[in-house]
């Protein structure tokens, strides 16, 4: 295989290969999601598939035996942001109901009962060792009672508390099977209510360990035995970008989460527009939505995923060869070197970039497991790295999103009418706070607009402030407007040219030219049409070109 080429930039590491190499099975599922939803946002679907592949692998307690970090679990954290109507809910339902439903049933009905019974017997035996007065039946009943008291294992959940997460973790440790899978929809609306739980997930990412909280032991609330072990966790946060990155407290909390450690743990997807591809007729759309090949592929992939719920595949420990480990370490070194090139204040970007290789390793493990491989190959690594690189670009879209002042300036310029403070408060969720805070935000918007071709004007009527704005169109030097004629006053027709060709006009003999156009093509000040994109300096010899 051709050695990959690495090239660093100030924002993200560009990892390129001879051709784009996404994981084959993942792309097959993505093709199905594209066909079913008619949405062309493939990166969103790739992350969605990556999450569910990792979920399947971690439920089966798949681990990676690395040569440098020891044994680590396969798991993935994902943040996927797309506008409403882009197919988030539809594609998620397809994954749950058509792709992994067979696996879910087989796992809950066969794998979980089998391994939980074995673990309960083992724990009961340990209890007997500690307390010889217990017979095997008594010890087994005690452990079974504790296990049942922890409730039914949740295959996935959409919210919770830190104590509930730790209780679920205790259930997983006693079962010695399964993983915790948080799937939080409308993350912008639900982030603040789940901060405590998300902080716990922060600790669980690397190896699936978290310290228990010290609680008072009472007769009614007995502190249970702390079991040592690892419990893999997966997380998928999805919603709309405008709700999460709203310039208010929610966005501040989210940015703090990234700084705290989620930047290095998550794969990112950020799309501000819906891509639907080429337009179709109603009949073409019907044929695409009812294509039998798509349904056939879904059934084939569902069966493949369902067969992964096999006792022989449980607790798979994936390995890497020396060459493939070196291949990954090369990527790790390049990630770290590229992160060192970032500015000192870009801590969040540094963390995301420096740990990108680790996310790729975990994802490669998921790819290897669903393919039925016992080893992580270079193909798995390159596929995972490709997606992590895409994630890095989307992460920078998230972290470099325009500030509230820029959005305020654009709103005033694009609304097309005068607005008052009342309009701003009603229309813009980020335009909040005290009068002085809003005044400062508006001041920043005016300053930002000044450097970004936006003019904001203020007028006052009866002490009421009216704001209006306009955007100056950026000049395209390949389409400059110029009028010229071989007559000094007549025949000045409008033409467009690029800047590189202007010297032919200015050097032509007996040719007159202007930056303006004129009514009736007649050159006269009173007939000039307002607007120009070319500035002509008439210098008669008082300035040296040198």
Task: Describe each region flagged by the PLM.
Residues 1-475:
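Phosphate-handling catalytic cores of nucleic-acid transaction enzymes
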Residues 476-546:
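Signature for HUH/AEP ssDNA processing cores
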């Amino acid at each position: 295989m051709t050695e990959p080429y690495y090239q660093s930039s100030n924002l993200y590491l560009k990892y390129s290969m001879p051709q784009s190499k996404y994981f084959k099975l993942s792309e097959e599922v993505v093709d199905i999601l594209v066909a079913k939803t008619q949405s062309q946002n493939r990166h969103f679907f790739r992350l969605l598939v990556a999450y569910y592949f990792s979920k399947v692998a971690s439920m089966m307690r798949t681990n990676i035996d690395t040569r440098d970090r020891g044994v680590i679990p396969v798991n993935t954290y994902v943040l996927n942001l797309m506008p409403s109507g882009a197919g988030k809910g539809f594609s998620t339902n397809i994954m749950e109901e058509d792709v992994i439903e067979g696996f879910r049933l087989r796992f809950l009905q066969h794998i979980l009962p089998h391994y939980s019974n074995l673990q309960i017997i083992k724990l009961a035996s340990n209890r007997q060792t500690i307390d010889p007065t217990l017979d095997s039946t008594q010890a087994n009943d005690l452990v079974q009672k504790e296990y049942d008291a922890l409730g039914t294992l949740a295959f996935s959940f959409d919210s919770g508390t830190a104590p509930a997460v730790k209780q679920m973790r205790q259930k997983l440790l006693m079962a010695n099977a399964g993983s915790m899978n948080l799937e939080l929809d409308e993350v912008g609306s639900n982030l603040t209510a789940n901060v405590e739980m998300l902080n716990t997930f922060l600790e669980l990412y690397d190896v699936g360990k978290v310290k228990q909280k010290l609680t008072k032991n009472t007769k009614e609330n007995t502190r249970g035995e702390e079991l040592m072990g690892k419990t893999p966790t997966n997380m998928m946060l999805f919603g709309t970008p405008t709700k999460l990155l709203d310039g208010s407290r929610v966005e501040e909390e989210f940015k703090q989460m990234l700084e705290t450690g989620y930047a290095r743990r998550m794969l990112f997807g950020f799309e501000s527009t819906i891509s639907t591809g080429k337009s179709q007729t109603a009949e073409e759309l019907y044929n695409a939505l009812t294509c039998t090949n798509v349904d056939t592929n879904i059934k084939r992939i569902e069966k493949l995923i369902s067969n992964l719920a096999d006792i022989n595949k449980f607790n798979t420990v994936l390995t890497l060869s020396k060459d493939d480990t070196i291949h990954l370490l090369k990527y790790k070194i390049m990630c770290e070197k590229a992160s060192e090139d970032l500015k000192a204040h870009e801590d969040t970007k540094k963390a995301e970039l420096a740990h990108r290789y680790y996310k790729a390793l975990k994802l490669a493990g998921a790819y290897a497991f669903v393919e039925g491989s016992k080893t992580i190959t270079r193909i798995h690594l390159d596929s995972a790295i490709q997606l992590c690189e895409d994630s890095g670009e989307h992460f920078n879209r998230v972290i470099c999103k325009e500030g509230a002042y820029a959005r305020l300036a654009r709103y005033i310029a694009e609304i097309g009418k005068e607005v008052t403070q009342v309009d701003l408060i009603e229309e813009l969720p980020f335009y909040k706070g005290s009068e002085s805070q809003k005044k400062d935000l508006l001041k920043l918007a005016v300053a930002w607009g000044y450097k970004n071709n936006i003019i904001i004007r203020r007028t006052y009527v009866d002490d009421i402030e009216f704001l209006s704005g306009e955007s100056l169109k950026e000049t395209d030097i390949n389409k400059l407007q110029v009028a010229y004629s071989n007559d000094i006053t007549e025949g000045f027709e409008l033409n467009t040219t690029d800047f590189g060709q202007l010297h032919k006009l200015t050097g032509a003999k007996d040719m007159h030219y202007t930056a303006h156009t004129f009514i009736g093509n007649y050159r006269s000040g009173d007939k000039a049409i307002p607007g120009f994109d070319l500035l002509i300096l008439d210098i008669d010899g008082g300035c040296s070109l040198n």
